[in-house]
Amino acid sequence: MRRAGFQASSLLGRICSSGLNCKKLTVAFSSNEHMAMSSWAGDLGRRIGTQLYRRENVAELRRLQAELQQQWTAAGDGRARAELEACARDEEERAFFRLLMPASGPEVTQRLEEAVKEVLGGRSSRAEKRERLYCAIALVARENAGRGIEVPEAAHRWFAADLGRNEYFGHMQFLIEHGVQLNAPAAFQLVRTMLRSGSELEVQLVSFKLFLYDTESRRVFEEKFDRVYDFMRMHYVITQMVVRRDFRFMRDYLEVLARRLEQHELCDARMSAAVQRDHIARYTELLMLYARKSGDEKMLAELFASLVDSLPRGMGGATLRQPLHEVMTYLISENQPQQVLKLVAGMRKAEPNRRPGKSSVPGTLALVVSALRQFNNPNLVVSFIVQAYRKTQTRVLLGQLGLWSLAFYGRAVALSPEAAKSPQELAQISPVDLPKELILKSVPDSCIMCELYQAILSEKRSQVPAEEYREILIQLFALYQDFMGKLVHKYDYYHLYDTSVLRLLLYKIKNEVGDGELAFKLLMDFYGQPKMRPKCTAEGNPFGVVLYQNNAITQTQLNQALALMGGLRIPMDFKTTSSMVLWYASAGDIDLAHTWYTKLVRGRFQMKNRRVLKLALAHGWTIPAYADQQLVSELSRADNSSDGPEHTQEAVETAVLESEEASACTSIIIEKADELLHKIQQTRPLDPPSDTRSAAP
């Protein structure tokens, strides 16, 4: 205890006009006698003077503070502390006495607020007020070592008004050194000024670049950058560095911003989901801004994948689908297929301490192929599929379906298994730097195959005359039908035994070629083959694809299709049922039309067709509660004599409904990503898809 007395005596003796009795102070610290403490406190109060609370005395004040905190625990010695406070000459002095006493958490902040209030309201000179404010901040810095110091906004406003422009650097250096939060408007306005119009040294200080040049000072960046700034201010500072094209330490900046987002904003239960989504969107936009300015798409892909991996459990799907779509779209626009692969491969590592199950790969590969298809390079898609699905039968499959020869030689002809396996054909493949996480020893499923068909046919449609495109589709259909006829005997290809590719080809023949009659004939011929029974559900009904809005078929053909569906036990779907409603209504048989409408309602199919709803309203049929009531009201108010806009709207909606048959098997990236993003958050490996109907019309 004598050491405590000596330090306090040394401090007071140095800065006061006359020395304080060292022996009396030592006695005060080494005993709890009331008279001794009162005598010491009184001398301290009289001698402490206006000169004590200055920056140059902070070090010794801290030593005194430490001795007081050692002598007085936060839970005890209340009387002694009260006696010390009572010796203060005014409220300002009392506020500083309290800063020296033990405290923690909110109490420290409250004491600082009191001290700031008293200093600013006192009669001291502006220079003296500045020194006292700095001293108060320095005294609480140790108490808030693990957190940023919340200095009252009033102090920041006072500093902003008092400081000269040439004093900004020293002021900010002091605040950063002591871990003061700079999020208050007045404080951050100084940061903005220094970033936008300051010297290079000022920019480096407020951006913390100054602390990134060596290992020792880097600790300041790592400990304080996300302490003095919140997420939004960090985002602003880093954005300014990107705009300045100052990329030297950009990975450090972006990684610490992501860490701040993951560990604070996204874990804060008080923050709404909308605000959290906004933060993720801002981070993504910053990544893409950096990529655009620097051309570093690699870092964009790596950091976004890392963000997805680190999100709190349960936060995926809707939160990430739009940012992922934007990142993918950007990488595609920049012709960066390799970065797309790295991005998706990185996203699979959702659990750093758990190896992702191989059963999750098919969903990931569907996302990759969907993305690669946007590059309009069928060779790239084929090369990726062959190298992702390492089974030799993959090349045999593409050869038998005519896709291999169409992609590499421009004609749809089958290749024998021997030819497909030959070194000459293998040489056609472009090397793809495929992450090991995306390799399977199996053949692609129907979802992947639909994407491949789309990739190849989209290019062909833009390159060849319409008649040649029609012949290509017919040839591919014949090869597909032949393949499916043999498929029941091939275990390797059981994943393809559904109607996904069938619906896609029929859709293209009916809608892209415009030959509804040919589509009908091909469909009937397909199911006329013996044992041709691919897996089919209401959502995957190929008859709906052909019958919907098809004016090229007759009543007899329609009845044949219905009879065949019944014989095959293929369930009715919306398109087939609504087609029957409209068919009988146009033929004048309203009773049968109503019968089919009743089936439509009982099946709880979505009421998407304006013509069906108009017909129901015209004849007083019951409109189900689940129908789009806004559309029903709109149709009820519509003037039947004004056909032009109504017909136009019907045409648009018909086109949308028809296009669903194609988009169902070639979903845009955000639709494909949704399931993956959701599953990334799960604790167990992904389950293999039980049905590929969502991947095809």
UniProtKB/Swiss-Prot annotation:
Q: Where mainly found?
A: mitochondrion
Instruction: Specify the superkingdom.
Output: Eukaryota
Q: Which keywords does the record carry?
A: Membrane, Mitochondrion, Mitochondrion inner membrane, Transit peptide, Translation regulation
Give the species this sequence originates from.
Eremothecium gossypii (strain ATCC 10895 / CBS 109.51 / FGSC 9923 / NRRL Y-1056)
Its subcellular locations are: Mitochondrion inner membrane
Mind telling me where the transit peptide is?
Answer: 1-65
Q: State the GO CC annotations.
A: mitochondrial inner membrane
Tell me how this protein sits in the membrane: Peripheral membrane protein
InterPro entries in the record, alphabetically? Atp22 (IPR017207)
In the record, the note on similarity to other proteins reads: Belongs to the ATP22 family.
Recorded GO molecular functions are: translation regulator activity
Q: Indicate what this protein is called per its UniProt record.
A: Mitochondrial translation factor ATP22
According to its UniProt entry, the function of this protein is described as: Translation factor specific for subunit 6 of the mitochondrial ATPase. Required for assembly of the CF(0) component of the ATPase.
